[in-house]
């Protein structure tokens, strides 16, 4: 049976594979072995549990709701990929690049993200229970660490990492947030002063005490 992996935007066939008892998983694995460029691939809702995708190039692919539990994605390029509500429980994402990926609502429980780069990734509602993030980064020098805290529902989403706090698009070390003057905060955004006056104590407590 022949299965085609197509471009999410124009329907162009990026890779095709034909074998007996074929599946999307087998086709994608064949594409990876062939070193196919699968940027923009439409893999929405695909069943890829346990797939061997080490080193895959899937930049800006559409993998919303895909099942990738226990998949092997070491060193994979997933920059800008839509992984909204994807199931990545137990997946091996060691050294994967996930910059600007959409991980809203994704399940990453027990996933290995050692040395993964998540710079700019959207993590709103992501489930990271027992995920290994100790050496994962959110850009150069920003260590995520295990058990990051996410605060949603306020004016801006807040990510509290091991070394840094990200509020909206502002990301600084915990110590920098602690030491910012009112004037520093006011320069960030027109609503920042009112927001910081209201939530500063709560955010800093969670950053320095609640994350221990």
What label would you give each PLM region?
Residues 1-37, 140-212:
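N-terminal capping/linker segments that flank leucine-rich repeat
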């Amino acid at each position: 049976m022949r299965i085609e992996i197509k471009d999410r935007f124009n329907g162009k066939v990026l890779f095709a594979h034909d074998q007996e008892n074929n599946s999307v998983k087998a086709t994608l694995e064949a594409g990876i072995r062939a070193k196919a460029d699968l940027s923009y691939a439409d893999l929405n809702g695909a069943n890829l549990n346990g797939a061997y995708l080490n080193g895959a190039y899937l930049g800006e692919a559409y993998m919303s709701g895909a099942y990738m539990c226990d998949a092997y994605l070491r060193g994979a390029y997933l920059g800008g990929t839509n992984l909204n509500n994807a199931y990545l429980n137990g997946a091996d994402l060691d050294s994967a690049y996930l910059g600007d990926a959409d991980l809203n609502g994704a399940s990453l429980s027990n996933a290995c993200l050692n040395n993964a780069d998540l710079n700019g990734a959207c993590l709103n509602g992501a489930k990271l229970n027992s995920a290994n993030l100790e050496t994962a980064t959110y850009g150069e020098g920003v260590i995520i660490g295990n058990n990051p805290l996410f605060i949603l529902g306020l004016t801006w989403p807040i990510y509290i990492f091991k070394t840094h706090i990200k509020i909206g698009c502002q990301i600084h070390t915990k110590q920098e947030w602690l030491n910012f003057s009112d004037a520093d905060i006011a320069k960030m955004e027109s609503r920042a002063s009112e927001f910081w006056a209201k939530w500063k104590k709560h955010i800093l407590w969670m950053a320095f005490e609640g994350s221990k």
